[in-house]
Amino acid sequence: MTATATMPATMTAVQFAENPFEPRPEHKFTFGLWTVGWRGRDPFGFETRPALSPVAAVQLLAEVGAYGVNFHDNDLVPIDATAAERDRIVREFRRALDDTGLKVPMATTNLFSDPVFKDGAFTSNDARVRAYALQKTMRAMDLGKEFGAEVYVFWGGREGAEVDAGRNPIDAIKRFRDALNYLCEYSIDQGYNYKFALEAKPNEPRGDLYFPTTGHYLAFIETLDHPEMVGVNPEVAHEQMSGLVFHHGVAQALEAGKLFHIDLNDQKPGRYDQDLRFGSESIKASFFLVKLLEDSGYQGMRHFDAHAYRTEDMEGVKDFARGCMRNYLIFKEKARQFNEDPEIQGLLREIAVEDPELERLCRGYSREKAQQLSQRTFDREALARHRLQYERLDQLVIDLLLGVRGR
């Protein structure tokens, strides 16, 4: 049995079953090589941790109980690697995956680090850069499929501007569409069967990015040649940077059948992209996100796109990874308690007013229904007096989250 499929050596089967906060393969927890491999460098300071090889990252993630590992092409294979070096790296990485049982559910392309992408990749004003970005992405798709990746994420970190005079944003959108249409056809032609997932962000590293929110991408997807192949990869911190309620955007993606992947982390309001440990800051928001994912039956990966504080050593990186998964499972257990709490559920039933006849009239237009509805009378004052009790409901949620429910 593999490291991810077995219970800890000191834990009995009964204890394992009784511990709802222990990660298991069915939870589908994944991390990127760049997350546990982040060395702590920031704009004001150098690295605080040693480099972590891809093989060592796989071993670390297996040790903490993750299901899988994801990567950008150059997280695994350096951009200037020779063919022989690439083959050796791939061979060693595959051996590490086989030894640990970790999966590679998602892959992506780094189109933001190298100076060639300083003014964009697919949206660059330079046709040579746009062509190179396509070539690099096709090769990265080949690499991801070698390891069985099923989802391919696109984050346009340099697809934006600081100087709006430099590029017509309509041209940028058209270029981005052309690139995705091309890559969809490449995936079809190669038999890869990828699901593409587009990841939004309002700014950083560019001053402004062309697709700032998940909603922008949901609208854009419908203009593609193969919209059925393309969904979204919302990230907690990215949407919070825009001042949005993250789980509302996730709900829209779920309702549209477009939540192909999700990036979980946390964020202080009004800050740069912090990539904090999931659930470490926004406790109520994280709870409602997990509740939404679990209640909706979301079947995809729970990917943690975050990193340990730069104060930490490698043991602290393990603490970070364990904390991400543990916090998710704590919120999952709290969601179960919410759904089974008689007082909370009773209050929700009181708040909602069901009227089958009105539902019939309001769902699915017909001239007859419109005529019947236009003749109905409503007591506005009585409707306005309906008691909602949201203060009480919200306090019950707070009590539940703080562990004092029923006291």
Language-model features, listed with the residues they occupy:
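Functionally constrained cores in energy, signaling, and assembly domains
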Residues: 130, 134-136, 201, 233, ...
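Short beta-strands and strand-loop turn motifs
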Residues: 69-73, 154-156, 198-201, 232-235, ...
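Structural motif corresponding to the early beta-alpha repeats
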Residues: 26, 35-37, 63-173
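Glycine/proline-rich, flexible active-site/cofactor-binding loop segments
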Residues: 144, 152-156, 170-204
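Histidine-acidic metal/acid-base catalytic patches
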Residues: 2-67, 78, 91, 98, ...
